[in-house]
């Protein structure tokens, strides 16, 4: 059967007929038409620390018992806490694992063995994570998972620190001429590091695939503060203006000096907006004036976006040359749910030729808090003339979902209808391609203490909504070490209603 041939099951409809006419019942009835047993990916993101803290077999037991997991996304390389380490310090500890934070021990890095022969074309090899001693998460977990018919996908991100040996050779250069903490896609040392690390994993371990995450956006959106924590972005520190990017820009016919002038003017616009200094013709008109005066602004933005796409393609083809059977794909960040500019750059049809799968973040519980942060930021820059609630309504309209008012969403989160709409939109964006769509599901992603928290029912409804929208699978996110087993159980409840539970 084709992987997108969906089996309509009268049995699933019979199960849900006895449920109350609630959102979950409606989703289960509709999703039953998209539920093909043994064809859906039920994935979970998990870091190395969980296997060390709880024991490999116990963790795998929990995954199967509470969520019917059939695919592991092992966080193998990162210097960030978003996908590795224990619970974020200060957030409530989950109902499993070590009941203490790893504030003094977490280092990040590569949680697998580094084989130097694959890094000959770069000065940067990454560093072996030291917080768990010599523990190799791939060597330990893959054989145990194989015995249970659970697949293993290596999961990594481009989150770095400035104190890593040789990292300066990879770093982006910001508008002010300083090294940034981020690294440049056009830098051969970084590109070759990425190719080296995926070759290392592909040749050294019995993996099923690789998923890479870059939760960054280009200089234009960053300068405008067009993301959930955008108010913290200094517009004079946007990237990248390194020699490699300048050379690439010139090859495209973009004048780097004009681009710098444009971004300096944009930085002044943003700084004045944050100080309440309204332009004579208003914020939106003034922004358009800058874009018309400096078309290099958008040209530089697209240079960055194309460089990311080229990195995707390079990773994809390098892995396929080594082992065509390995799946390769990408994680698209939550900014996709808030910033229309960023969404425009996430052209799924353009990404599909170099993607076996794409995970789209649909983190509904934390989305309310994050959307509120985004609105707070852009209401001081490009949309400074629009009252915040009207601005939110505008975004609901152009992004095609309807959630609660601005004053409420940090405390309610987004509904499962948002997950449904985003899955349907992404499915349509991938129409006619062979790329699998995996919906990223929020399970206890940290929020502020008084803001919305996940629940078993909320997780259940999000999973049901994803399958109603014809997702090829789900990925329970962000990391197991912050998830409550009681909330994870909500995923299994949904899968049972869909007859996808083993």
Please state what every model-predicted region is.
Residues 5-26:
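N-terminal export signals
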Residues 20-43:
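C-terminal segment of N-terminal export signals and the immediately downstream linker at the start
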Residues 35-54, 444:
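Boundary/entry segment of secreted carbohydrate-active catalytic domains
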Residues 50-66, 106-143, 307-311, 414-422:
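Aromatic- and glycine-enriched glycan-recognition loops and surfaces
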Residues 58-80, 204-207, 469-473:
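Catalytic domains of carbohydrate-active enzymes, especially glycoside hydrolases
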Residues 62, 120, 124-125, 129, ...:
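Polysaccharide-binding and catalytic clefts of secreted carbohydrate-active enzymes
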Residues 69-130:
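Aromatic-lined carbohydrate-binding/catalytic grooves of carbohydrate-active enzymes
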Residues 355-369, 412-425, 432-493:
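Substrate-binding cleft of secreted/luminal carbohydrate-active enzymes
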């Amino acid at each position: 059967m084709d992987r997108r041939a969906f089996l309509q099951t009268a049995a699933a409809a019979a199960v849900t007929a006895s449920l109350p006419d609630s959102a979950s019942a409606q989703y289960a009835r509709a999703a039953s038409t998209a539920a093909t047993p043994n064809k859906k990916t039920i994935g979970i993101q998990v870091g190395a620390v969980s296997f060390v803290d709880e024991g490999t077999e116990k963790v795998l037991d929990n995954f199967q018992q509470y969520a019917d997991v059939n695919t592991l996304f092992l966080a193998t390389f990162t210097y960030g806490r978003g996908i590795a380490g224990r619970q974020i310090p200060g957030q409530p500890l989950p109902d499993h694992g070590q009941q203490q934070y790893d504030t003094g021990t977490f280092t990040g890095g590569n949680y697998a063995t580094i084989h130097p022969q694959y890094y000959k074309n770069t000065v940067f090899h990454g560093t072996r994570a030291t917080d768990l001693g010599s523990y190799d998460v791939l060597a330990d977990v893959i054989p145990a998972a194989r015995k249970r018919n659970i697949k293993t996908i290596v999961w990594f991100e481009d989150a770095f620190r400035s104190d890593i040996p040789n990292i300066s050779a990879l770093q982006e250069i910001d508008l002010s001429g300083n090294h940034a903490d981020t690294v440049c896609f056009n830098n051969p040392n970084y590109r070759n590091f990425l190719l080296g690390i995926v070759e290392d994993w592909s040749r050294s371990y019995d993996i099923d695939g690789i998923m890479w995450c870059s939760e960054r956006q280009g200089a234009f959106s960053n300068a405008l503060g067009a993301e959930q924590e955008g108010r913290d972005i200094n517009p004079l520190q946007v990237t990248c203006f390194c020699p490699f990017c300048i050379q690439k820009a010139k090859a495209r016919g973009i004048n780097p000096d004009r681009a710098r002038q444009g971004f300096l003017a944009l930085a002044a616009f943003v700084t004045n907006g944050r100080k309440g200094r309204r332009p004579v013709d208003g914020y939106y008109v003034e922004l358009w004036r800058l874009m018309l005066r400096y078309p290099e602004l958008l040209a530089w933005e697209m240079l960055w976006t194309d460089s990311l796409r080229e990195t995707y393609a390079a990773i994809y083809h390098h892995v396929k040359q080594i082992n065509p059977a390995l799946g390769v794909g990408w994680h698209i960040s939550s900014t996709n749910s808030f910033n229309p500019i960023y969404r425009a750059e996430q052209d799924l049809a353009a990404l599909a030729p170099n993607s076996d799968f794409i995970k789209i973040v649909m983190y509904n519980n934390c989305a309310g808090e994050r959307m509120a942060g985004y609105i707070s930021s852009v209401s001081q820059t490009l949309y400074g003339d629009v009252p915040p609630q009207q601005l939110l309504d505008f975004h609901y309209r152009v992004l095609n979902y309807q959630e609660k008012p601005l004053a409420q969403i940090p405390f309610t989160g987004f509904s499962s209808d948002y997950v449904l709409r985003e899955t349907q939109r992404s499915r349509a964006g991938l129409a006619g391609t062979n790329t699998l769509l995996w919906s990223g599901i929020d399970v206890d992603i940290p929020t502020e203490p008084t803001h919305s928290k996940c629940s078993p029912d909320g997780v259940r409804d999000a999973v049901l909504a994803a399958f109603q929208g014809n997702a090829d699978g789900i990925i329970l996110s962000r990391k197991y070490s912050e998830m409550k087993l009681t909330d994870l159980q909500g995923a299994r409840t949904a899968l049972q209603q869909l007859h996808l539970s083993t």
